[in-house]
Amino acid sequence: MPQVDPDLFDPGQFQAELALKSSPIPAYKKALRCAREVLDARFQEGRDIRRLIEDRAWFVDQILALAWNRFDWSEDADIALIAVGGYGRGELHPYSDIDLLILMDGADHEVFREPIEGFLTLLWDIGLEVGQSVRSLAECAEEAQADLTVITNLMESRTIAGPEHLRQRMQEVTSAQRMWPSRAFFLAKRDEQKTRHARYNDTEYNLEPNVKGSPGGLRDIQTLLWIARRQFGTINLHAMVGQGFLLESEYTLLASSQEFLWKVRYALHMLAGRAEDRLLFDLQRQIAGLLGYEDSDAKLAVERFMQKYYRVVLGIAELTELVFQHFEEVILPGDAAGRVEPLNERFQVRDGYLEVTHAGVFQETPSALLEIFVLLARRPEIRGVRADTIRLLRDHRYLIDDAFRRDPHNTGLFIELFKSRQGIHRNLRRMNRYGILGRYLPEFGHIVGQMQHDLFHIYTVDAHTLNLIKNLRKLFWPELAEKYPLASKLIEKLPKPELIYLAGLYHDIGKGRGGDHSELGAADALAFCQRHDLPAMDTQLIVWLVRNHLLMSTTAQRKDLSDPQVIFDFAQKVRDQTYLDYLYVLTVADINATNPTLWNSWRASLLRQLYTETKHALRRGLEQPVGREEQIRQTQKAALDILVRSGTDPDDAEHLWTQLGDDYFLRHTSSDIAWHTEAILQHPSSGGPLVLIKETTQREFEGATQIFIYAPDQHDFFAVTVAAMDQLNLSIHDARVITSTSQFTLDTYIVLDADGGSIGNNPARIQEIRQGLVEALRNPADYPTIIQRRVPRQLKHFAFAPQVTIQNDALRPVTILEIIAPDRPGLLARIGKIFLDFDLSLQNAKIATLGERVEDVFFVTDAHNQPLSDPELCARLQLAIAEQLADGDSYIQPSRISI
């Protein structure tokens, strides 16, 4: 810490200012403000970050000492002001906690009550927020014995004012000889770290990571130091080198990583104006600019900054894991000498952990760099890798070069890992953490820490990829068969499961380079397969899966699956039942690995429907597709059979059907048609809107709630309906709109409740929805079509210009309106209002919300039930949608019209 820094704080000048005024408060406030401005300016100039946070601690020392000395403590008073915790280490960020201990020899606090209260009141008045405790030596010992946080705080302390001997005595009464011996302290800190990591989903790769508490964050480094200090009296990171816990190169990496996180944390506090340790979306871009990152052709500045962040914390996590393992071996020694199990000439198991038989193993046999992970997969009961062996792995990564990658023995070992029945994900994750995976597959190395700046992809590309492989492995678990029945059944039947793991490894590997990542990944996958000498048929399947890994999800979510042509087109691209099985399983794992909240019962139902319809098409033969007329005939016959069995007059049903048109029978199942028909025939003509509600399937983890509305058509029908559903907290995922020749509308909406699930068997909720819709449709003029609700913070940050595409369908007499826009509360209601203003009729809609963006497709006609044909009308429609959905700060993006 500096002895004096007059630019930051000049004690003489400060004392002179105090003498000029009756109240000390203005002078203290001015000093605090000026110090913050000086330090912030130095930060923006790029000054050394360690010096900055130490300078701030020094400055606060001066302020506190001067404030303390304003009060009468008497010369021989046994009371001291002690800095503890991070402040005790001499580290302070702009809004870090200033933790103080007012320490007394005796237990009688009353003696010093008046000056203590005056001192703390002064700190409050000048705006210096501190965390304080007032304790005697005996109370310190008692509190420290009972509370891990207290003993940890007291281990790092400095005397700010008062006699130093009090702090030294406190150190004695709370020493490891008196309480919290190193073994107990280590076990408690290890459990504390596990609990903390679990709060952040055990990943370094959260979208808005906490630079202090997340895995690989500053707290992990501090935890190492606390344990080392308790056991060995270590005072700083570099001392761990001399004690044999870190190599000099590891210390250098850890110290530079710590300084990077300090810069990020300082910037966070400075920009947020508060103690903010979360890398919030709305600050990530600003920090990227502040730290000098710029956009490139392939990556945004914020993506480059966050990739650096993720790689730094991954490196910290790797090193802290190594040192933790080292601590465990030293502090918790097992019966190492008597529990050695040789595996081969290169490896043995000691006390449950894998290790090399001698330090030269990797140098003599480089293939052992891969063999170690194959052994771990074969022996899942092995608890991990010993610290010295982890270090040797890290030190010998350089041996993995092009010759190593081409060696048939090494390629065979890598493929063997994917054929393991257990431990594939766990050992790939280990390989990634130890830097082996990115070294063996340089293309994978490029995606390590690669984020995508959106809410759709909540993991970095490498974390997402490994999560996908974990999801594939979990599909073998019997307990997941209920949630993923079809995927669990299919993965058991796949002839070569290792091929889907390899496709999963490569499916997103082309991201971050610009261009089509599916095509880039397919090229990389082909090169991988050829280098690993995979059979031509296996290579063809892997490359096809990588190239088409988005095909099934985009078809299910964006196309009308009731259209036979959609199924035929998809089946033509798949062409083979085995390919369909692999693609379905990969798609399920991919969606769940992208963002678990994206997987809902409706998406599950859509994918099953697409799989089943395609399976039938492939069995029937692609040269014999079912025509529209044949499908309508079959659907009507099946529906009529159901109705006759329930006692409905077939003549009444067929008379009603003549008013509905072909699309109705293409877009509904026979059971739904029977359900609609029976209810309509029984509904009195003067009974107002008919609203039917039921589940789309009885499968527990699939489907959604289906709302069918039959009512006289009215101009604002869609706008009022979606606004009412918005007010009822329903999210619409699909809409099918039919208008009969008798001018009745038959609308079906597929909805999920606010929690992402279907309504289920909830009579009260069903009645609330039915009443709300009937009331809105009976009194449309009184119903607000636009509901103003607060936009969530994260959505606000991801504003972008809406994209509106208008084109006529080549196969059907409708216009396709595609909208990509930021998600906002009430968005569909706004679109419905625009349709109303432009006199458009909605025929069908596919609604998809992907993180912070919606990608909706609407099939519309004009007032005469014809496709849109007026370019000027389309241009005005396009502009109206873009203006209505645009964020206030975003521009209107030019979009395409093709009519």
From Swiss-Prot:
This is Bifunctional uridylyltransferase/uridylyl-removing enzyme. Its cofactor is Mg(2+). Residues 461-583 form the HD domain. Uridylyltransferase (UTase) activity is inhibited by glutamine, while glutamine activates uridylyl-removing (UR) activity. Disruption phenotype: Cells lacking this gene are not viable unless a second mutation occurs, either spontaneously or by design, resulting in the inability of glutamine synthetase (GS) to be adenylylated. Residues 706-789, 816-899 form the ACT domain. It holds the Pfam family HD. Has four distinct domains: an N-terminal nucleotidyltransferase (NT) domain responsible for UTase activity, a central HD domain that encodes UR activity, and two C-terminal ACT domains that seem to have a role in glutamine sensing. The gene is glnD.
